[in-house]
Amino acid sequence: MQEKIKKPTNLHKLVILARKNADFFQDLDRRAYARITKGDQRGELYPLDSSCFENWLSAINFKVHDEVANSKLKLDAREHLEVESRLSGKNYNVGLRVISNEEFIEIDLGDQDWKSVQITKDGWRVRAHKNFFYRNNSIKALPVPCRDKLDDDWVESIFNI
């Protein structure tokens, strides 16, 4: 007797699709995130319980399967991926504009290139993010500091202090 081959469910297809296009982890407060991959560049970071993540799920599902994912499918996929994120053991510090410790301060510039100013006891430099930053809708781009034109009040002007 032949075994019946199970056809993948829409949930299974959406979860597989999401895994191919994002990395999943949780922050130190156990909130699950997706880091959307865009080529070699670190892409946007979405909390799984956000409308941004839900919209992203809709977009990738429509792009690949040419159909709209209903609300229940997106909710089920999100819950599935949240559990996977928590069980994966991947935990990272996620900052909103600033992350720091005893050795450095990193300030997200909020630009499209995902650059930040990294400040250490040895100085500062602009480079790709070293850490994870979440950007809500109120985060706007900061001016990129330039060594040649940097005035002494750059930090004060950025933070309005």
Predicted regions and their residues:
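P-loop NTPase catalytic core of nucleic-acid-dependent motor ATPases
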Residues: 37-46, 121-161
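Long, basic/Gly/Ser/Thr-rich N-terminal segments
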Residues: 42-130
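N-terminal accessory targeting/assembly segments
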Residues: 1-73
